[in-house]
Curated annotation (Swiss-Prot):
Membrane topology annotation: Multi-pass membrane protein
Stated name of the protein: Lysophospholipid transporter LplT
Cytoplasmic compartment segments: 39-52, 112-144, 188-226, 278-280, 326-343, 388-397
GO molecular function: lysophospholipid:sodium symporter activity
Gene3D superfamilies: MFS general substrate transporter like domains (1.20.1250.20)
GO cellular component: plasma membrane
Keywords attached to this entry: Cell inner membrane, Cell membrane, Lipid transport, Membrane, Transmembrane, Transmembrane helix, Transport
Entry's family note: Belongs to the major facilitator superfamily. LplT (TC 2.A.1.42) family.
Main location: membrane
High-level lineage: Bacteria, Pseudomonadati, Pseudomonadota, Gammaproteobacteria, Enterobacterales
Periplasmic side: 1-17, 74-90, 166, 248-256, 302-304, 365-366
Length: 397
């Protein structure tokens, strides 16, 4: 990995380009692997309610390692942390390829993702500063969503051809991410020399949680992003069951095409947020959050493919406009109070706890036999109400 004493804070520095490429490949692997592994579960006749369990073991790793990964990101050069984390993802994907239980392999990928996330977002504040940070977040989100778009489609299409080919493509993507990480400059650790006593680390993490929760702005950001990503992951699994019921289509590819529409929309929404929203005007994003739930409700009632595509793209636009300013707000305020790595680790805990809760409720609803269309209607209505309540609370405080 190259050494760098002076950091070029340009939005298009070599270091930033390497981060964006590594993020794209890593996120591509994550999303292709999800749909490839779902196809594997179908081929091996796992029950439908087990599909969300796959994502639950993934996010469970985030929650389990949440007290430690922020300190890891702040104690070492973040580029090296990202490279190690992508190596773990590569190992997990390869293990599924070689016949290891898919839930175990996917858990290992989750451990890698848990270590990767604080480093990938924390490094943005080290490679660029000030007004460029929101734009850097926009680039990161755009790269991520482009990877979701292409990775999801690739996973579904390749799985329709051959599941093993789809799994191998995921492993190759993770390998490419490891190589891209080599070109990230070696920056000084943000907070070196911290204690590695697990009890002290847990206590320190809880202190970071408390500090961020007591601050009105960071609490607002944590709740908003947690609701968004919890809902987003649940929507992905909802689509897998909704497509054959509402549209009468039973292949692996169609749900990935529909997910791709959300991804395209988020790219557009993220770009709009970077231009129209600043750290001082974050509340502008809240109406978009409410509209996400409203459009999900309308979408659940559709029975034609073209309106479904259009509505999912609109959901994505609203989502990108909603989440990018909240991410930037947390990074800026969190960097000054608890360190960027710890702030993102706390954010991951909130987001993944929301995912675990929402996926658990969704899996239970499927298990007890509630039809998927009423699930979608209730899901959209509850999300709109939750964001409305958050906005009212934010305006009062």
């Amino acid at each position: 990995m190259s050494e760098s004493v002076h950091t070029n804070t340009s939005l298009w520095s070599k270091g930033m380009k390497a981060v964006i490429v590594a993020q794209f490949l890593s996120a591509f692997g994550d999303n292709a692997l999800l749909f490839a592994t779902l196809a594997l579960l179908n081929a091996q006749f796992y029950p439908e309610w087990s599909q969300p369990i796959l994502q639950m073991v993934f996010v469970g790793a985030y929650i389990l390692f949440a007290p430690f990964v922020g300190q890891v990101a702040d104690s070492f050069a973040k580029g090296r942390v990202m490279m190690f984390a992508n190596g773990l993802k590569l190992l997990g994907a390869a293990s599924i390829c070689f016949g290891i239980n898919p839930f175990l392999g996917y858990t290992l990928v989750g451990v890698g993702a848990a270590a990767y996330s604080p480093a990938k977002y924390g490094i943005l504040g080290e490679l660029t500063t000030g007004s460029k940070l929101v734009k850097a977040n926009g680039l990161m989100e755009a790269s991520t969503i482009a990877a979701i778009l292409l990775g999801s489609v690739a996973g579904g299409v390749l799985a329709d051809w051959h599941v093993l080919v789809a799994l191998a493509a995921c492993a190759l993507a993770y390998g490419g991410a490891v190589v891209a990480n080599i070109y990230i400059p070696k920056l000084a650790a943000a907070r070196p020399g911290q204690s590695w006593n697990l009890i002290n680390m847990t206590r320190s993490f809880l202190n970071a949680c408390t500090s961020l929760w007591r601050n009105g702005e960071t609490r607002f950001s944590l709740v908003g992003t947690s609701l968004f990503w919890g809902a987003g992951v649940t929507l992905r699994f909802l689509l897998v069951l909704w497509v054959p019921v509402a549209l009468g289509i039973t292949d692996n590819a169609t749900p990935t095409y529909l997910n791709a529409m959300v991804a395209i929309g988020i790219v557009v929404g993220a770009g709009a947020a970077a231009k129209l929203v600043t750290l001082e005007t974050v509340s502008r994003c809240m109406p978009a959050g409410i509209l996400i739930g409203v459009v999900v409700l309308i979408f659940s009632l559709q029975h034609e493919l073209l309106p479904a595509y259009a509505l999912l793209m609109l959901i994505g636009v609203m989502g990108g406009f909603f989440v990018v300013p909240l991410n930037a707000l947390l990074q800026e305020r969190g960097k000054k109070s608890v360190g960027a790595g710890n702030a993102i680790a706390v954010q991951n805990l909130g987001e993944n706890s929301a995912m675990l809760l929402m996926l658990g409720i969704y899996s239970l609803a499927v298990m007890i036999g509630i039809p998927v269309v009423p699930i979608g209607i209730g899901f959209g209505a509850l999300f709109a109400l939750a964001i409305t309540a958050l906005w009212i609370w934010q305006r009062r405080h």
